[in-house]
Structure formats: structure tokens, C-alpha cells
Design a protein with these regions (language model features):
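A short, polar/proline- and glycine-enriched secondary-structure boundary/capping micro-motif
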Residues: 124-127, 145-146
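Conserved small/polar residues in nucleotide/adenosyl-binding loops
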Residues: 155-161
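Long, charge-dense
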Residues: 134-149
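Ligand-binding loop in jelly-roll beta-barrel domains
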Residues: 129-131
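Short, charged/polar connector segments at secondary-structure boundaries
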Residues: 1-109, 115-119, 125-126
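Acidic, proline/serine/threonine- and glycine-rich low-complexity intrinsically disordered segments
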Residues: 151-153
Length: 163
């Protein structure tokens, strides 16, 4: 079953990839290190482990894995790679016992970027899970006159409770 799930996920991923290309938008996962300059970060705060909404997991931290996924976290690599075998194995694990290990994410401006666990997120999104258990590190931006940054006050926020 896991091979069929992978091939189905790839079909979804490639459809999304081509839709993005046709619209002229970036077809891969957003990469946090391309979005922010570390010099714009005041500090990082560990928020520990919590359930986070998968709909707010929007990208990855580094560019290394991004081209394996369409921007909806579905895989786009053909079957027969080490990546596809690991994805299929995670799919079996999810069906048989559930994925139990926390992923690791950075939270920035109420969105989450995966540091460890991109394939787990992909599998969970494929199976339409609502949340994922994650170790969360918040990146707190330096004070800025940018209205997008000013609207988010990080001094008192906990994890978003938007489920």
C-alpha cells in the first residue's frame, strides 16, 4: 500500500508543482533562510514540545530538501529513490501505529518551518492529519517599523491556538 500512497502523493505534488509554474509562482516549499536575514532576529526562544496545526507548517528551514516537495509538501521525486522508500516506510508507520516522533520547527511570524521531519509532515499532510507534535523554537524579530512585524507582538505570545 505504501508504494501506491507514494505514487498518489507524487501525482498530487506534481499537479501542484505545475499549477504553480503556470501561475508564475515558486513551485517548491518556502525556505526560511531565504525569507529572513539572521541579523533581523533579536533572539530565539525554545517553546518545548506541543501539537501544532499542520496548516501552519508552510516551509522548510534550509534549501537542501525543498526541491523534493511541491509547495504543498507533497513529494515530486519519482519512485525508486532512497527518499521515496523512506517516505513509503513512514506512510506504513502512520497507517500501522501513527507517527510518534516530534518534528523540529522554527516558528516565525506565526508560521512554522521544518528543521527536521519534512517527510513526516508530508506523510501527515497526505493523510490529512490536523496537527503534528513538534519541538518549537520561536524566532523573535528585532523591533521594526514594518507593519507585518509590528502586528505580531512576541513578548506575550504562546503557540498559536488556531486549530
Amino acid at each position: 500500500m505504501s508504494v501506491q500512497d507514494y505514487l498518489s502523493a507524487v501525482k498530487i505534488g506534481k499537479k501542484e508543482y505545475h499549477a504553480c509554474v503556470n501561475k508564475g509562482t515558486y513551485p517548491y516549499l518556502p525556505v526560511l533562510e531565504d525569507i529572513i536575514d539572521e541579523s533581523s532576529i533579536d533572539r530565539e526562544v525554545s517553546l518545548g514540545s506541543d501539537q501544532i496545526p499542520l496548516r501552519l507548517v508552510v516551509g522548510t528551514c534550509t534549501a537542501g530538501r525543498t526541491t523534493a516537495f511541491a509547495d504543498n509538501f507533497m513529494p515530486i521525486l519519482d519512485w525508486g529513490t532512497e527518499f521515496s522508500a523512506k517516505w513509503a516506510s513512514l506512510s506504513d508507520s502512520q497507517v500501522n501505529e501513527g507517527i510518534r516522533d516530534d518534528i523540529k520547527v522554527y516558528e516565525y511570524m506565526n508560521k512554522f518551518y521544518v528543521l527536521e521531519g519534512n517527510k513526516r509532515v508530508s506523510v501527515l499532510k497526505y493523510f490529512k492529519a490536523v496537527t503534528v507534535s513538534a519541538q518549537v523554537i520561536r524566532k523573535i524579530p528585532k523591533y521594526s517599523d514594518d507593519p507585518d512585524v509590528k502586528t505580531v507582538s512576541y513578548t506575550h505570545l504562546t503557540l498559536p491556538t488556531i486549530l
